[in-house]
Regions:
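A short alpha-helical cap/connector motif
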Residues: 3-182, 186-210, 214-343
Length: 343
């Protein structure tokens, strides 16, 4: 028989059952109070949880205030990355994982096309220029080349608009058209379209143009006024505009890291369609933030796996036709329209 049972029966005889029952209830209540007083870890955890919730709410408020403040800056400030603090990005919209970067795609295109001339807008550190072995021109108002280059190069430290206004802009190419171009300049749709118009005029039917940042991963990356460190701007609008106004072009969006790439072929240097329509696109291009990015862009259903594009035998045939001076390569380029999309 247990000691507690023996003591309990003895107390029942001496004090009476009702008194003993009151004492037992008081004992249980006392034990509970003591446990609560001694459970320091639980009380600290509770306070920590409350503090984290408060800090999270404060952090979200500060982030919202920062995004609002950044949105009141000028367009010029949106490209000034030096010494600026950006808001943390939003979660990315789910999309198929990209297996290649833009530079890896560009490198493979250099190998496949062996371009005689290469033109680039947006030199920055020179990482993409380093891929070229052709006679090359690079345009960027603030480039800081930090890598070894291996091409016959002329650079212009000015905006692309100023460059295209020069009478001697393409003298370095000695009259040859652009074989391969990479547009990675100002991340605003009207600038990107103007760059494409000017580049196409100096291309041939067999030329290839690559445009970066056409597949933002969330709406914040697509803001016209930069808020986050990772920024694509509203260049994504180019895909819709080109598809609508220039159905003759072959457009192949690629699922590349980080923010997608657009390959454009079947060019027509004589076309004036885009230039004629440019002024009428103002409202569409300059729509205020936040931008309404189409779902097939965010999810990349519209895109092609870059490996499929690069594996096509179109490239070898395109080089042969280019070197032979063939004028009509449209049927060849149209084969790329058959590449399966991720959606």
């Amino acid at each position: 028989m247990g000691i507690r049972s023996t003591v309990g029966r003895t107390l029942d005889r001496v004090l009476g059952p009702s008194t003993v029952q009151r004492l037992r209830r008081a004992e249980v209540a006392g034990r509970r109070r003591l446990i609560n007083l001694l459970d320091v870890e639980a009380r600290v955890a509770s306070r920590s949880s409350e503090r984290r919730a408060s800090e999270s709410a404060t952090g979200q408020q500060r982030r919202a205030e920062l995004i609002d403040a950044l949105g009141r800056r000028s367009l010029a400030d949106s490209v000034n990355q030096e010494g600026m603090t950006w808001a943390t990005n939003d979660p990315f919209v789910p999309h198929p994982p990209a297996t290649m970067t833009r530079h890896q795609v560009l490198q493979q295109l250099h190998r496949a096309l062996a371009p005689r001339t290469y033109f680039e807008i947006g030199v920055r550190w020179g990482d993409s220029l380093a891929l070229s072995r052709a006679r090359s021109i690079g345009v960027d108002p603030a480039f800081k080349i930090r890598c070894e280059l291996h091409c016959d190069l002329r650079t212009f430290a000015e905006t692309s608009d100023d460059f295209f206004a020069r009478a001697d802009a393409f003298d370095h190419f000695d009259g040859s058209p652009i074989d391969l171009a990479f547009i990675d300049g100002m991340h605003l749709s009207e600038f990107a379209l103007r760059d494409f118009i000017n580049v196409e005029r100096r291309c041939a039917r067999g030329s290839v143009v690559v445009i970066d940042d056409v597949l933002p991963r969330n709406n914040l990356e697509a803001y016209r006024l930069r808020r986050s460190k990772s920024w694509a701007g509203d260049v994504y609008k180019l895909h819709g505009v080109l598809r609508r106004l220039r159905p003759d072009l072959v457009l192949v969006p690629l699922n590349t890291k980080p923010t997608g790439t657009l390959v454009v072929v079947n060019l027509d240097p004589e076309s004036s369609v885009l230039q004629d329509a440019f002024d009428g696109l103002g409202d569409e291009f300059t729509s205020p933030d936040p931008q309404s990015v189409p779902d097939d862009i965010l999810t990349r259903r519209v895109a092609v796996a870059p490996e499929l594009l690069l594996a096509s035998d179109v490239w070898q045939q395109a080089v042969e036709l280019r070197n032979a001076g063939a004028a009509d390569v449209g049927p060849l380029w149209k084969q790329l329209d058959a590449l399966p999309r991720l959606g």
